[in-house]
């Protein structure tokens, strides 16, 4: 009997992807945009619902109606301390319904078999840890740096935070292959330009406990 291919699905907090193991190797399946990962985002406009890359690409212009990080809410109550902490970083609103959080990647792994249905064979990991955790550390660090340099608190401005988060995510990716990344954002908040840099060593220091926990 020929061996059936094994399919792996990573429903991540920030990005999702699908891979198939066959012919002795893993192949990542591209989405309809040709990308090997798909942002775990959904957005709502007056006329349509956007998913993945299309949703993430318009987040700066439509932050209140663009949902991400939703996986963090699974199995938690609205008054959970982690939910309340996460909500401070979201431009969209969450509310309580029967004690559960509702809205308009965690680091976890499950092994399943597919034979007359799905059967979970094993699961492990930190279901609350995702890429956004690392981004949040850098965002918070730069919010403090901006206030220290310019005497302005951008922490309550959703659009400014979204632009800063996008720049932090880009810098994080750069640091995976370089020792330093530049962050340049024109007119970030109240007309003030923000130019700074972050080293890989500093990023690792900000996220040291998260790295050790994995």
Swiss-Prot record:
What Pfam families does this protein map onto?
Answer: HSP70 (PF00012)
Write the record's keywords in alphabetical order, separated by commas: ATP-binding, Nucleotide-binding, Stress response
Q: Which InterPro entries did the record assign?
A: ATPase_NBD (IPR043129), Heat_shock_70_CS (IPR018181), Hsp_70_fam (IPR013126)
Top-level taxon:
Eukaryota
Looking up SUPFAM superfamilies in the UniProt record yields:
Actin-like ATPase domain
**GO MF annotation: an example:** ATP-dependent protein folding chaperone
Task: Please give the family membership noted in the entry.
Answer: Belongs to the heat shock protein 70 family.
Name-wise, this protein is: Heat shock 70 kDa protein cognate 1
């Amino acid at each position: 009997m020929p061996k059936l291919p094994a399919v792996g699905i990573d429903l991540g907090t920030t990005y999702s992807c699908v891979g198939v193991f066959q012919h002795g190797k893993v192949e990542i399946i591209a989405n309809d945009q040709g990308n090997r990962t798909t942002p775990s985002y959904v957005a709502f406009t007056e006329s349509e619902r956007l998913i993945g890359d299309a949703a993430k690409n318009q987040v700066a212009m439509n932050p209140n109606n663009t949902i991400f990080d939703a996986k963090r809410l699974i199995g938690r109550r609205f008054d959970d301390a982690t939910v309340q902490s996460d909500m401070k970083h979201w431009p969209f609103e969450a509310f309580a319904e029967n004690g559960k959080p509702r809205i308009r990647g965690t680091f976890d792994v499950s092994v399943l078999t597919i034979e007359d249905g799905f059967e979970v064979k094993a699961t492990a990991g930190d279901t609350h840890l995702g890429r956004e955790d690392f981004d949040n550390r850098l965002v918070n660090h730069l919010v403090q740096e901006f206030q220290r340099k310019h005497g302005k608190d951008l922490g309550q401005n959703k659009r400014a935070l979204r632009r800063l988060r996008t720049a932090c995510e880009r810098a994080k990716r750069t640091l995976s292959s370089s020792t330093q990344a530049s962050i340049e954002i024109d007119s970030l908040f109240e007309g003030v330009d923000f130019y700074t840099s972050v080293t890989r060593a500093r990023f690792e220091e900000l996220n040291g406990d998260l790295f050790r926990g994995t």
